[in-house]
Amino acid sequence: MAEEEVAKLEKHLMLLRQEYVKLQKKLAETEKRCALLAAQANKESSSESFISRLLAIVADLYEQEQYSDLKIKVGDRHISAHKFVLAARSDSWSLANLSSTKELDLSDANPEVTMTMLRWIYTDELEFREDDVFLTELMKLANRFQLQLLRERCEKGVMSLVNVRNCIRFYQTAEELNASTLMNYCAEIIASHWDDLRKEDFSSMSAQLLYKMIKSKTEYPLHKAIKVEREDVVFLYLIEMDSQLPGKLNEADHNGDLALDLALSRRLESIATTLVSHKADVDMVDKSGWSLLHKGIQRGDLFAATFLIKNGAFVNAATLGAQETPLHLVALYSSKKHSADVMSEMAQIAEALLQAGANPNMQDSKGRTPLHVSIMAGNEYVFSQLLQCKQLDLELKDHEGSTALWLAVQHITVSSDQSVNPFEDVPVVNGTSFDENSFAARLIQRGSHTDAPDTATGNCLLQRAAGAGNEAAALFLATNGAHVNHRNKWGETPLHTACRHGLANLTAELLQQGANPNLQTEEALPLPKEAASLTSLADSVHLQTPLHMAIAYNHPDVVSVILEQKANALHATNNLQIIPDFSLKDSRDQTVLGLALWTGMHTIAAQLLGSGAAINDTMSDGQTLLHMAIQRQDSKSALFLLEHQADINVRTQDGETALQLAIRNQLPLVVDAICTRGADMSVPDEKGNPPLWLALANNLEDIASTLVRHGCDATCWGPGPGGCLQTLLHRAIDENNEPTACFLIRSGCDVNSPRQPGANGEGEEEARDGQTPLHLAASWGLEETVQCLLEFGANVNAQDAEGRTPIHVAISSQHGVIIQLLVSHPDIHLNVRDRQGLTPFACAMTFKNNKSAEAILKRESGAAEQVDNKGRNFLHVAVQNSDIESVLFLISVHANVNSRVQDASKLTPLHLAVQAGSEIIVRNLLLAGAKVNELTKHRQTALHLAAQQDLPTICSVLLENGVDFAAVDENGNNALHLAVMHGRLNNIRVLLTECTVDAEAFNLRGQSPLHILGQYGKENAAAIFDLFLECMPGYPLDKPDADGSTVLLLAYMKGNANLCRAIVRSGARLGVNNNQGVNIFNYQVATKQLLFRLLDMLSKEPPWCDGSYCYECTARFGVTTRKHHCRHCGRLLCHKCSTKEIPIIKFDLNKPVRVCNICFDVLTLGGVS
């Protein structure tokens, strides 16, 4: 709407803008003409020109007698006028010639308008007034006397006053005066606001003009003529369109409205009659299938409906889709939404429809008849009209299977009784809503069937009402002849339905009316969607009595009604009542007592028991109610049954007792009650588990405590692994179930017994390992269990079959917390040895458990000094094993680093570390205070030991730490002797370079290190010899040992060719004899090859030997036997042994010189044997 208004205003503004532009153009033209005239005029002052004077004189003659030759009658006055002035303006002043006229009569015109015209004629001045009537009259007067300029000025003045409300009037005026500008302007405004014009706006317009305008403005002139309620215009349209009738009469406009419907909706009976007389279709329908009669009723138009019915409209026409007849629409009216007058008019229409032959049994798209609709709408007026119709079928059902009576029993009337409702504005529901004046009562009086069973479900109206929770309706039907034992397709009676929905009053009434409380359903009822969350007790069950239903759906008030009825039925005078049977079972084999328990109705259950219900009845699966209550975990029901003496000894088909079931279902109160009643607490289940274990295995300590409190044995010997005997404590520890183990300990079970063989000796290792619970807990690392065992007096020093105590087991299993607990125990003995002879400390060291070892040392300070069967303490063993971690640990706990092995060797840890070759351990022992000069039983220091092995680094470490490098052992050997003896080149280098050891010292055998080298030299002897000379260039090579043997002789005797060559190369004497007269020339060897090569390699003359006898023939020198020397080998010879002479070129001896036979051969043959 707002957008349309804006569009119209914009169009109107556009017209005004166009008009303004025209005026601007005209003004510009006028100014142009004025300037042109001024240029052509006399150059004299404009006030002195002839034209100016003439105009001024004419203006002054207005209403003056001067020069007057004419009288004009204006109203009651006579005005002096001048013919020449009038003639100058127009020639149309009178029918006669103006020159012969003495008086002009204008008394028929408005005097004020006339005077305004005369003033303009004389002065050319016109005063506009905001009065459209005045301007219109002035324009008409100007048109009468053909004063064209005045008319144009008035026309423009009127245009500024035109609006929606007066545009029609001005259009008429413009048309009369042929004022085309004004007429076009009004036409534009009419076109812009065509739909906003009212019938009053057209009332003064002539029929011809209005018809002409309507035809020009709309495609549907007839509809517009009816809307403005102009019958004369309709008549003109009918005359003009006579050839196209009646087709034109049945056309719908853009809004889908028919001409006849427009006339009827405005109550234009004459026009409507005219249209009908010209064959307008009274049954014409719109695109929705609604006829004129439907529309008339829809808008509550009694006039239209009556007119159409009288003119033969089809009274059974149905709309498209909804299929509603006029009777349906009439019935839809409700007194809650419409006034009593409207309702009365609808009743008149209904009466007229029925009199005209309307069918009261027609059904709409939902299958509802007008009677259905009137009941649903509460339309008592139409309802009463329909009941009077003899053709009315009361048993027709809608698509939901509902008869009119079903709808009526759901309709509660509002009482108008002042005693019930003293305040008219606040309606209240009357308690007796189904009185004789109610729809339902009137339908039954008219003959409606009270049962009307549904074809799909077989439910009668009574069952439907009860199922919908409408107890008042159900009571009404029950007391008005409904069949109380009617059964639907599932075998359910109204009493079942009432019990299922908790309708206590209806249940009582049905029982009074003779309903059978022992009828059982034949099939399970379908589960409604909204009941999906309800208890499953009522799902898929049949063979239910009404009492089953009431209990299953948890309606205790209904149950009470039936129980009271049983008590009353025995004394009732009414033979209709039947006594309920409480022993009947449903398809799940449940009695009403069981259902009462499951729904928590224990008061009802007690009453049922009081009425003779059996408490120990078994179901088909062998379960009693007590078993079922426990399995449902319904403690309240189970306790209820126990209080009422239910049998606790009955077993299920699986052999389970009530006690086992109660434990399995975690019901502590029920367990307590069963134990209180003397149940056997030792009965095992099918797996051999006693009740106490069942409780503990499921973490039910409260139940276990209850069992123990009632005297249950916490030890409980039973079968174990491999058929041995074990307690529950053994089993709990084996399964790592600490809470259970601790509970059993606190409950006083046997904490010290190991497992036992079975009665016939059954059992494998477990039966004979002798491990107590404390051993087992320590092995599995069960800290809480160990602590609990210690608190409750377990033997901390008990030994198993291997002699191990619990702390042995804990250490071997590396459980630190448990070790700490055991070490902290006041009664523990830390010196107990197992069969391997290991104490706890030894065990800790074996498993490198330093933390445990330290804890033991804190408790037992001498533990670290204990020795094994080889006399070794832990430090000795750790050093021998090169276990630096253990060594460091023992050092950290201040173990004695100088303790000796308690055997024949008496070695210290430092000796052992050197033997093991561990530099890091040697260093740490020295740092820890080990004595570096401690001697072995052979009086050897650690340096002696290191020198014998290839341990140069350790030798350096010992030297750095101040070892006595000059110390000699029992054979007088210092470290260098031993290093040379074992050929340790690197050790020798360290000794020769890093200390001042005496390299020429003789041992007890009179041998220096080089003698040792000659005697014991190995492959690297030559390298060692070179090292000696490198470190000691002036070493005495020819110094003999105690036997008089030099290094060369010793090496030659050992066949050490490399060493011999090195010694000869160093300039040693070749022919020195030992004490036995042996030298390298006469020593018996297999071949002289080595000797010849040694002689051949001589590069300079060797030193001469000295002595008292010949080195070759041993002849003593005297006066007759002179001394000679071999110039090649330097030996001392007699004359006979040195007869050969030969130049020795390599010695730069060019003259022949004396040589021995061997050297002669070497020099002549080249060293070849």
From Swiss-Prot:
The modification N-acetylalanine is found at residue 2. The lineage of its organism: Eukaryota, Metazoa, Chordata, Craniata, Vertebrata. ANK repeats lie at residues 217-247, 255-284, 288-317, 322-362, 366-396, 490-519, 542-572, 588-617, 621-650, 654-683, 687-716, 724-753, 769-798, 802-832, 836-865, 870-899, 905-934, 938-967, 971-1001, 1005-1037, 1043-1072. It comes from Homo sapiens (Human). SMART domains: ANK (SM00248), BTB (SM00225), FYVE (SM00064). Interacts with RAB5A (in GTP-bound form). Interacts with RHOD (independent of GTP-loaded status). Interacts with EHD1. Interacts with VPS26A; the interaction is independent of EHD1 and is indicative for an association with the cargo recognition subcomplex of the retromer complex. It is found in: Cytoplasm; Endosome membrane; Early endosome. GO terms for molecular function: phosphatidylinositol phosphate binding; small GTPase binding; zinc ion binding. The modification Phosphoserine is found at residue 270. It is a peripheral membrane protein. This is Rabankyrin-5. Zn(2+) 1 binds at residues 1110, 1113, 1134, 1137. The keyword Acetylation applies. A zinc finger (FYVE-type) spans 1104-1164. Keywords: Acetylation, ANK repeat, Cytoplasm, Endocytosis, Endosome, Membrane, Metal-binding, Phosphoprotein, Repeat, Zinc, Zinc-finger. Its main location: cytoplasm. InterPro entries: ANFY1_BTB_POZ, ANFY1_FYVE, ANKFY1_BACK, Ankyrin_rpt, Ankyrin_rpt-contain_sf, BTB/POZ_dom, Multifunctional_ANK_Repeat, SKP1/BTB/POZ_sf. Residues 68-130 form the BTB domain.
